[in-house]
Swiss-Prot record:
It is found in: Secreted. GO terms for biological process: defense response to Gram-negative bacterium; defense response to Gram-positive bacterium. Residues 23-47 form a propeptide. Belongs to the frog skin active peptide (FSAP) family. Brevinin subfamily. Antimicrobial peptide. Has activity against the Gram-positive bacterium S.aureus (MIC=6 uM) and the Gram-negative bacterium E.coli (MIC=3 uM). Lacks hemolytic activity against human erythrocytes. Expressed by the skin glands. Residues 1-22 form the signal peptide. It comes from the Eukaryota. It comes from Rana dybowskii. Residues 26-43 have a biased composition (Acidic residues). One of its GO terms (cellular component) is extracellular region. This is Dybowskin-2CDYa. Keywords: Amphibian defense peptide, Antibiotic, Antimicrobial, Secreted, Signal.
């Protein structure tokens, strides 16, 4: 029983570390993408598409009047 708990705990920590490293890499990729002017244009186009159709698909919050 102890070895099973030990193994599961080890797997949990390895998974947490892997997720943390993946998140850091993803954030670095996002920062890199923001620095590229072509990628910024695509990002702005995607945002404007969400802005136009976001409320219809539930992607944008409704404004309170």
């Amino acid at each position: 029983m102890f070895t099973l708990k030990k193994s599961l705990l080890l797997l949990f920590f390895i998974g947490v570390i892997k997720l943390s490293l993946c998140e850091e890499e993803r954030n670095a990729d996002d920062d890199e993408r923001r620095d590229d002017p072509d990628e910024m244009d695509v990002e702005v186009e995607n945002r404007s598409a969400v802005g136009r159709h976001g409320r219809r698909f539930g992607l944008r919050k409704h404004r309170k009047h």
